Amino acid sequence: CALTIGTYGVARKRNDNKLRFYSMNFDQLGVIESSLDDLVPSKEANWTNYPKGVIWAFGEKGMKVTSGMDLLLNGNIPNGSGLSSSASVEVLTGYILRDFFGFDVTNQDLALIGQLSENKYNKVNCGIMDQFAIAMGKKDNAIFLDTATLEYEYAPIHLENAKIVIACSNKKRGLGDSKYNERRSECETALAELQQVVKIKTLGDLDEETFEK
């Protein structure tokens, strides 16, 4: 059991501060240029806000990217399908930066850096699940993850004659322009109210019996 789709890239370091991005999935946009001195999200930057955000997030973690790069991406994850194409770009960028600059980070760290970039740079209040699944995924296994503690274990999946089917609903899904942030805020409000009467750290700590009381 494994998704046979993904995001792929080739990159090269530059001797200056320029950042040049090209996606074969958005070839109509051509090459989008920026620089290490301009790590500010913008509508004009389009999809490159994701790799730029990761470069920014590494800097926030004390790992400065000291030279620019040329990055070409190609992916077959349907955009807006809920399969985390943006998170895959973030994790892939993290892999490339780790390789280029020798940053001492684990795959789990790359997931957290991707989440940081999405939360603080792209202003989407996502959780860790998408980036974690991409960075830590293992063939023929699901991941049982406690997102509050990041404790996890692999759960082998042997489907035999069964299949997991991903269907296209033709409904585009993007966290940035969806009700995600609103739903997240509602859950946080509910947690704060519940914490006034029960001792829980997350909504996941609330068992059914206590809830029914």
Regions found by a protein language model. Name each.
Residues Y8-N46, G59, N141-K213:
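C-terminal nucleotide
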